[in-house]
A protein has these predicted regions:
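Structured, non-membrane catalytic/scaffold regions adjacent to prosthetic-group chemistry
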Residues: 2-231
């Protein structure tokens, strides 16, 4: 019988059996049951074209506060979008502003920069923990449903600087950020048409100095898998 405690690590924090970090261990349904070895290789899933589409962070094995970039978790709701060359990337600000604004990558980087260290966790991280804790469900897979948690240093331009350049008004209540990744979520109703991933921010949050348009992570320009060219 499984017990809640085994030494210093509670059962619900134990990792899945360590079978290495080779994506070939994913079964035919695409589920990944491995955990990285102590060399801290990330747990990854690949798409049909051999591109990494998901990473889980080995939180219990890390040293220090900053998660290395290649171990920083990723979650994909849609397919990974095509790479946008730097000279073709644009940021458009429109709606309830005095002056609609379009910036290319070089123009965005002319704004004063700011670096922010922050902890990020997916809202779905360990979603089934409490069912297990109340003996109402099986032990969650650490690599499937948890360890979607990382810390990084992000460098970019405060969103407030760009919004102020466009000129917000009394009617500017929310910011709707629309990304470049397009698709249909697995949980969407039948007949849902593809759409671009988007998120909303109250204007107070958008104007916070730590809300930035990041173009670098951990001292290097953003990688495509982590949101390049720019990540909000």
């Amino acid at each position: 019988m499984t017990t809640r405690q085994d030494g210093a690590i509670p059962d619900f924090l134990k990792m899945d059996d360590a079978i290495g970090s080779d994506p070939a261990n994913a079964n035919k349904t695409g589920n990944w049951h491995g955990w990285p070895t102590k060399d801290l290789n990330p747990v990854t899933l690949m798409d049909d074209e051999g591109r990494t589409v998901r990473i889980r962070t080995p939180v219990m094995d890390l040293e220090g506060l900053i998660t290395p970039t290649d171990l920083h978790y990723t979650v994909q709701h849609f397919a990974v979008p095509p790479v946008v060359p730097t000279d073709q990337w644009e940021l458009k600000i429109h709606g309830q502003v005095k002056n609609e604004l379009t910036l290319n990558f070089a123009q965005l980087r002319r704004f004063p920069g700011r670096s922010v260290r922050t902890v990020m966790e997916c809202s779905g991280s360990d979603a089934t923990f409490f069912e297990y804790f109340k003996d109402e469900g099986p032990k969650p897979s650490r690599t499937q449903e948890c360890m979607i948690l990382s810390t990084g240093e992000w460098t970019g331009v405060p969103l407030a600087a760009v919004l102020n350049a466009a000129g917000i008004t009394d009617k500017s209540l929310y910011v709707r950020a629309v990304g470049n990744d397009e698709g249909v979520p697995a949980t969407a109703a039948e007949g849902t048409k593809p759409f671009y991933y988007d998120k909303g921010l109250p204007i107070q949050k958008a104007l916070h100095p730590d809300t930035i348009l990041a173009y670098a992570q951990n001292g290097a320009l953003l990688e495509h898998l982590h949101g390049a060219r720019v990540r909000l």
